[in-house]
Amino acid sequence: MTDRYAATAGAYDLMNAPWRAVQVVALEHLLPLLQPDAGPILDVGAGSGVNIEWLLERSPDAQVYALEPSPAMRALALSRIAAHLEWQHRVTVRPEDFFAATLPERLGGAILLGVLGHFDPGERAAVLAELADRLPHGGAALIDLQPPERPEAVPAATISRTQVGELEYRLIAEATPIDDERLHWRMTYLSLEGERVLTEDTAEHIYHHPGPDALLAEAASVWLHAERLGETTYWLLRRA
């Protein structure tokens, strides 16, 4: 199976750096709402394991149940865990996606950052229903919606660049609309010495952009209260 995130994994945390501060603020809002005594914290699309690390460092009672189907991204997460032997009994990193994995019956909370757009409307409804069924009353999940809020053409532009020693790592993104919810994204990852390109990898994704109003309505239909935290982040609270 082709790993669509193999290109991304090469410098994932470097490329994600411009958005990490926003994610951390959202995680800090989520932390007091987690109920680790009710079940593990579900991390869907765990990526490099950066949110696993954040949780395990700040919630000593938490167990994490992570899903990451990309072999390249999963290798990053497992390498992060391997550096902390004390975490190995507190975290499971499964290679399946949301619908292939056996989910815990009860969850103490959930994190879905950068993943909701991978689900079409029917799949998105099923994900929200599964969360509502497994979260305790008052339990919370953290999600985000990737910009733009509605599909529109995005001209090619550098959206992230980081200098590490003598080399620069650069991410160029562009997108074209497919319909009223989907965008076709093209992401180009470069490593450069000056302006000389050393490596160039490209990944293409079809991503769903449901918009805030649609998200709030879909969440409410399964008794999840969606509340906006920042420009792109939301938490979902399980109503009694």
Task: Label every PLM stretch briefly.
Residues M1-G47:
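Conserved class I S-adenosyl-L-methionine
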Residues G49-A100:
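Class I SAM-dependent methyltransferase SAM/SAH-binding core
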Residues T102-A110:
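A short acidic, Gly/Pro-enriched loop at the edge of an enzyme's catalytic core
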Residues A125-H137:
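A short glycine-rich, Lys/Arg-flanked "PGG" loop and its adjoining helix->strand segment in the class I
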Residues G138-L145:
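Conserved beta-strand signature within the Rossmann-like core of class I S-adenosyl-L-methionine
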Residues L145-P210:
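SAM-dependent methyltransferase
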Residues H208-A240:
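C-terminal lobe and adjacent flexible extensions of AdoMet/dcAdoMet transferase-like proteins
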